[in-house]
Amino acid sequence: MCDDDAGALVIDNGSGMCKAGFAGDDAPRAVFPSIVGRPRHQGVMVGMGQKDSYVGDEAQSKRGILTLKYPIEHGIITNWDDMEKIWHHTFYNELRVAPEEHPVLLTEAPLNPKANREKMTQIMFETFNSPAMYVAIQAVLSLYASGRTTGIVLDSGDGVSHTVPIYEGFALPHAILRLDLAGRDLTDYLMKILTERGYSFTTTAEREIVRDIKEKLCYVALDFEQEMATAAASTSLEKSYELPDGQVITIGNERFRCPEALFQPSFLGMESCGIHETVYNSIMKCDVDIRKDLYANSVLSGGTTMYPGIADRMQKEITALAPSTIKIKIIAPPERKYSVWIGGSILASLSTFQQMWISKQEYDESGPGIVHRKCF
C-alpha cells in the first residue's frame, strides 16, 4: 500500500505486456505478459490442483502445456472475459490491492472504439467496484513523460503502431495514423527468416523464444543495402544464441533484416508506408503552422522503438522527406519502453488532475457514457 490512503493505480494494458503500479512511482511495480493460458491436456496427476486458466508469467512458464491467447489484439481489447482475468490478476496477485480502495487510471489505444471505452468503464465500476477511474490515450501519456505537451509520438508496441500529433496536450484525431505493424509481426517475420536458415520455430511457445532473440540481438541498420553487403562479405555481424535445450544457433543479417520491416513493410507483404513515412504523413495532415513544432519534437515510445540505431535511422529518413530548412529532432528517451506508464503515473499524481476522475457516484448517475464527456 502507498502511504496515502487512496493512492491511485496506473494500469497500461498493452497487446504484449501489461504494466501496472502506483501513481507517483517512477517505474511500474508489475510488468507481465498480457496472456491467458488454458490447459491443452487433461491433468494426469491427481491433486496437482490444475487451474482452468493461468495469467501472465505463470501462463508463460507453463506455456508447453497451455494454449496461449492474447485478449488485446492490435492495441484494442477483443476478449472481455480474458481481459477481466488479467485485471483481476493485476489487482489481487501482482499489486495485491483491493480495487475498491483505489482510483484507477487505465490507458487506451488512440482511435479506440467508443463502445470499448464504455465497457472498460463498466467493468471497473461494476465488477471491481472502483471508487473512481479515468481513461487516457497512451501516446499522450508518453509525451507527458518526456516533459512536453506538443509533439508527435510514434508509439510502437507489440500489436500496433500509431503516430499521434499532439498540440498543447490535445491529440489531433484527424491526423492520427494507425499502422498494423508492430513487435508481434516482427517476431513472426524473424520466425520465418530463421526457418529459411534451417531453424524451425512454429508453436506459440517457440514464438516466445524468437521474441527473446529479437529483443537481445536485433538492431536497425543506418543504410540497409550497405549493411547487407557487409554481412555478406564477412562474419563480423554474426552473433550466437543458446536455445533453452542447449543448442546454439547463429544469426547474421537476420539481426537487421527483421526490424528493417518497420521501414519497408513490403518485407512482410504489406502495402502500407514505413514508420518514417507514416510520421511524415501524420505531420502533413496537421495545420501548417504547427508542423515545425512537430518535426522538432518527434518522440519515440513503446518496446518496438527499443532497437539500437532506430533514432538515427528515423532522423535520416525524415530529413529526406521534410523541407530542407526544417529542424528535425527525434527524441528517444531511454525509459521509452515504459513511458506510457510513467506518463500515467505523472498525470494521476498531479493535484490539478484530481478533479478529472470519474467517480462511482457520477457513473451511477450517468452510466458508462460519462467516459466520453470526462476523458478526451
Curated annotation (Swiss-Prot):
Residues 1-2 form a propeptide. Disruption phenotype: Homozygous mutants are viable and fertile, but fail to form proper IFMs and are flightless. The IFMs of these mutants display mislocalized Smn and Actn. Its EC number is 3.6.4.-. InterPro entries: Actin, Actin/actin-like_CS, Actin_CS, ATPase_NBD. It is found in: Cytoplasm, Cytoskeleton. One of its GO terms (molecular function) is ATP binding. It catalyses: ATP + H2O = ADP + phosphate + H(+). CDD domains: ASKHA_NBD_actin. It comes from the Eukaryota. In adult thorax, expressed in the IFMs. The modification Tele-methylhistidine is found at residue 74. Abnormalities in Act88F-ifm(3)7 flight muscles result from incorporation of the mutant actin isoform into assembling myofibrils. In Drosophila there are 6 closely related actin genes. Belongs to the actin family. This is Actin, indirect flight muscle.
